[in-house]
Amino acid sequence: EITTRLVGSEMCIRDRISENAMTALSLVYPIQNFANAIAIGFGIGISAQIAICLGAGNKETASKAATHGLALSALHGVLLTIGCILVMPGFLVLFTSDADVIDLGIRYSTIVFLFATINTTNLSYEKIFQGVGKMKVTMIGLMVGCVSNIILDPLLIFGIGPFPAMGIEGAAIATGLGQVFNLVFYLIVYKIQPLQVRLSRKYLHPDKALIARLYSVGIPGALNLALPSVLVSALNGLLAAYSQSYVVILGIYYKLQTFLYLPASGIVQGMRPVIGYNYGAGEHKRVKKIYYVTLCMSGVIMLVGTIICLTVPGQLMGMFTTNPETIAAGKTALRIICAGFLVSSVSVTACGALEGLGRGTASLVVSLCRYLI
């Protein structure tokens, strides 16, 4: 969903705002991804606890986990807004001396991070719905956010109709408003459709043991998702010494990779609460069956992604830039890197299964082997 929004923004600005805008987005991406990793990772902890508790028949604790998780997610959003806005200028200077790129990056990221609390709360609701098995609700919610973002992009970027032309800032506002509409949808559904868990002030009294369980999955989950940001930042530093075009290529690749991973990630998201519920109910044989079925499905999806990258790499790169040299170099890079897609389906599925079982640390170890080694 996050990548889909970025794709919409970047396809609109690529010709009219220049490749500097693409470079700025590529440099901002690691911090933006890190902020999202914290929100999504902690949300995975919420979803896992809800599913395990419901599987064990403990609805009261599941409701406490949802309420605690929502409150803590809102707090995370406030901290992310402050921290990311303060860090971004110094972060951009590490990778470029181009004043225009730095200015574009700061303007875009400041607006995006002002919506951080909306985003963390939104993702918390998403994981609560997933934890109780309401996958269709989250799918529609993501579509609401995505479609509204795609519609708003050209209106705010180019100034169509009554809207002013805002350039890259318009892309950032469109992304933020997409998150707002997504959250509003979840709030409406929660009010009109009863869930197995209830959010209530009476559950806000701090439960240290429950909070510890949320973070025991949430922190490793966030680190799992943040590891690509660390890798991208390190690679950006190396590539910036050679050419700004290489930074653009890396940024495009990671967005394409995430987009291609979306179907597999969606299946893994569906697997987590099902595994957690059955684990809580003591159905261990069913847990194994769910894992192997998910692994096979993810493998097929990643094989298709590999074939696409091998056959039409130029067209994929051309979605983000019109620079012939960037497209030519990107084609070669994409064909080489996609060789690891199929193997990565094993680690992606294993991490999701371990998180669903509440074993966040083991999941983190698997991710560390994938990214750091």
Regions found by a protein language model. Name each.
Residues 1, 50-117, 163-219, 275-340:
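Short alpha-helical transmembrane segments in multi-pass integral membrane proteins
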Residues 32, 76, 144-149, 174-182, ...:
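Transmembrane alpha-helical core residues of multi-pass small-molecule transporters
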Residues 1-8, 12-13:
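Single conserved hydrophobic/aromatic residue that forms the stacking wall/gate
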Residues 14-33, 100-104, 168-169, 210-217, ...:
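Interfacial/gating helices of multi-pass transporter permease domains
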Residues 10, 17, 88-91, 152, ...:
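Hydrophobic/aromatic end-of-helix segments at the C-terminal termini of transmembrane alpha-helices
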